[in-house]
From Swiss-Prot:
Gene behind this protein: petM
NCBIfam families cross-referenced by the UniProt entry: PRK11876.1-2
Source lineage: Bacteria, Bacillati, Cyanobacteriota, Cyanophyceae, Acaryochloridales
Places the protein is found: Cellular thylakoid membrane
Subunit details: The 4 large subunits of the cytochrome b6-f complex are cytochrome b6, subunit IV (17 kDa polypeptide, PetD), cytochrome f and the Rieske protein, while the 4 small subunits are PetG, PetL, PetM and PetN. The complex functions as a dimer.
Alphabetized Pfam families for the sequence: PetM
Protein name in the entry: Cytochrome b6-f complex subunit 7
Superkingdom to which the source organism belongs: Bacteria
A GO biological process held by the record: photosynthesis
One Gene Ontology molecular-function label: electron transfer activity
Keyword Electron transport in record: yes
Topological relation to the membrane, as annotated: Single-pass membrane protein
Keyword annotations: Electron transport, Membrane, Photosynthesis, Thylakoid, Transmembrane, Transmembrane helix, Transport
UniProt key word Transmembrane: yes
Length: 33
């Protein structure tokens, strides 16, 4: 039970990190002028 919760937390955390990284890269790659 606890292991399942831990795995879910790790997957969620990884998805959040990937999402933030992708959003940051998109913002950096988009020309601001």
């Amino acid at each position: 039970m606890a292991e399942e919760i831990f795995n879910t937390a790790v997957i969620t955390f990884t998805l959040v990190l990937v999402g933030l990284g992708a959003g940051y890269l998109l913002l950096r790659l988009t020309p601001d002028d």
